[in-house]
């Protein structure tokens, strides 16, 4: 039996990476030299935060997004930690609030002023003190306001409620103490009811973040995970790490059964940590390697092989860290679906890279921009702590659109051809336009309207078929003969469509003449 390549239809097959011009990069940025395997960069629609080198303690820079070009060597820093800063994260519901963690075993919450910093910012709003050793990761809850998670080198995950009026919070609302080694990665599912962790003891765990109990645990010896990621509402986990032969590897897991991975994909023999990023709106997975010069991207599908390789973005400069712009900060006019900010230490440069879907039309592309998470929380901290779960508040990326009311996301989505959900209002609007389009040209010729409308519907129905085959439903050709047959069918279809266009033009001219005659005769009546 001969081998045939597997054809997949995907609107994201031709996505490409577009680096920013030199004028739109951030130059002369003193990026940290820390060996921690973190992103070291956090981005929102207003600011870029990047961990920097600082003597006598830890600090990070907060640069306005529009302030591109060369950075002033004396640019003000956000400093106040006694040890090196290891991680920074913007509050998803407040673009002017950021959390930082440090080797001094504390977490600090900062209010960033809307105007430009003129001097070093040393006054923090809150300080969280609870870890016994340095704190390596911080993560905001995706749906509840003012809930922050932290993990430290004391092998503990702590849950903090920032609604407290105290400026120094000494005790978390919950301490999760089930890990036997350092936590390397944390990830929430869409509504924040589950927390996944990757630990240095080679185990992946799925936890109940409120109860602190372990729901699932992976003891698979063939994959050593460094980073773990929930894949939206697909009930799947993706981890990146190394195989038993020390090759870099990705593994896909069922969140309800972590005994064996669903699939494994070996990449290469490099040693840099792989950072995965998942876009639930497009079902696309991006994999960025520390020290690499490229970005791999895949499309997640429900059918095997699940991870469908699309393309690879190449550049000349290796990245030490990476930042990602939230979807609400993208440029929809250029069909941008993802944006990275590469930290290039060899050139002290931050380079934006936009992932773009090539489209000819400049209008808003509804099919690649379904409703996405907004900057509004769906729960208060107390509601979440009491046991409530809600899906994120969604918003449309169409310019001028308002956030939608909180609504649950679909439990299962069609992965092979992701489409944007359409509101009933849009259907009603479309139906009214179609009805008007069918009546208006023939309002003066009522006796011809029924016959023409019936013919129009019948011919429009035929345009979907070619020689008895539905062009959009038939499978892709697998042999040369099938390909030729499909080509000839399409040629016939094009020829027939041209004839239909010619007929429509003749009908339009006839109608124009009849309307002109009626207008000329109307004064006499």
From Swiss-Prot:
Keywords associated with the record: Actin-binding, Coiled coil, Repeat, WD repeat
SUPFAM superfamilies: WD40 repeat-like
A Pfam family of this chain: WD40
Coiled coil stretches, renumbered: 485-524
SMART domains in the record: DUF1899, DUF1900, WD40
One GO MF term: actin filament binding
Recorded superkingdom: Eukaryota
Each WD repeat, start to end: 80-120, 130-170, 178-217, 220-263, 269-308
Family that this chain belongs to: Belongs to the WD repeat coronin family.
Family annotation (PANTHER family): CORONIN (PTHR10856), CORONIN-2A (PTHR10856:SF2)
Subunit structure: Binds actin. Component of the N-Cor repressor complex, at least composed of NCOR1, NCOR2, HDAC3, TBL1X, TBL1R, CORO2A and GPS2.
Name of this protein: Coronin-2A
Organism of this sequence: Bos taurus
Classification lineage: Eukaryota, Metazoa, Chordata, Craniata, Vertebrata
Protein encoded by which gene: CORO2A
């Amino acid at each position: 039996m001969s081998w045939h390549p597997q054809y997949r239809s995907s609107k994201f097959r031709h996505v490409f990476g577009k680096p920013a011009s030199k004028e739109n990069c951030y130059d002369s940025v003193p990026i940290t030299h820390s060996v921690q395997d973190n992103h070291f960069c956090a981005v929102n629609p207003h600011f870029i935060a990047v961990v920097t080198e600082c003597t006598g303690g830890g600090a990070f820079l907060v640069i306005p997004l529009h302030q591109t070009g060369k950075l002033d060597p004396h640019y003000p820093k956000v400093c106040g930690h006694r040890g090196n800063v290891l991680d920074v994260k913007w509050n998803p519901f407040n673009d002017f609030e950021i959390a930082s963690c440090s080797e001094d075993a504390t977490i600090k919450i900062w209010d960033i002023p809307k105007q430009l910093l003129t001097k070093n910012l040393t006054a923090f709003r809150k300080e969280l003190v609870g870890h016994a050793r340095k704190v390596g990761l911080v993560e905001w809850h995706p749906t509840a306001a003012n809930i922050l998670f932290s993990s430290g080198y004391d092998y503990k995950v702590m849950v903090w409620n920032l609604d407290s009026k105290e400026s120094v919070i000494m005790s978390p609302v919950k301490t999760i103490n089930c890990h036997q080694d350092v936590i390397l990665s944390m990830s929430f599912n869409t509504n924040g009811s589950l927390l996944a962790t990757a630990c240095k003891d080679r185990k992946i765990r799925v936890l109940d973040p409120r109860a602190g109990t372990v729901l699932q645990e992976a003891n698979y010896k063939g994959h050593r995970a460094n980073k773990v990621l929930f894949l939206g509402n697909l009930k799947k986990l993706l981890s990146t790490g190394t195989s038993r032969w020390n090759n870099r590897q990705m593994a896909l897991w069922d969140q309800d059964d972590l005994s064996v991975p669903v699939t494994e994909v070996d990449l290469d023999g490099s040693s840099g940590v792989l950072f995965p990023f998942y876009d639930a709106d497009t079902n696309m997975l991006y994999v960025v390697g520390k020290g690499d010069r490229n970005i791999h991207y895949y499309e997640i599908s429900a059918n095997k092989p699940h991870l469908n390789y699309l393309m690879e973005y190449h550049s000349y400069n290796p990245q030490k860290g990476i930042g990602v712009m939230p979807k609400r900060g993208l440029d929809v006019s250029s069909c941008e679906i993802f944006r990275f900010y590469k930290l290039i230490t060899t050139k002290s440069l931050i380079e934006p890279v936009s992932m773009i879907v090539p489209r000819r039309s400049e209008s808003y592309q509804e099919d690649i921009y379904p409703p996405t998470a907004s900057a509004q929380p769906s729960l208060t901290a107390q509601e979440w702590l009491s046991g409530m779960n809600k899906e994120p508040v969604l918003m449309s990326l169409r310019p001028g659109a308002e956030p939608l009311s909180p609504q649950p996301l679909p439990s299962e989505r069609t992965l092979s051809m992701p489409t944007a959900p359409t509101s009933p209002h849009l259907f009603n609007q479309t139906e009214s336009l179609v009805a008007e389009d069918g009546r208006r040209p023939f309002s003066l010729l009522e006796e011809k309207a029924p016959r023409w409308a019936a013919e129009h519907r019948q011919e429009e129905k035929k345009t979907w078929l070619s020689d008895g085959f539905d062009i959009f439903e038939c499978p892709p050709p697998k042999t040369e003969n099938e390909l030729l047959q499909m080509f000839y069918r399409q040629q016939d279809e094009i020829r027939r469509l041209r004839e239909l266009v010619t007929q429509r033009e003749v009908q339009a001219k006839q109608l124009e003449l009849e309307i002109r005659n009626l207008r000329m005769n109307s004064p006499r009546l």
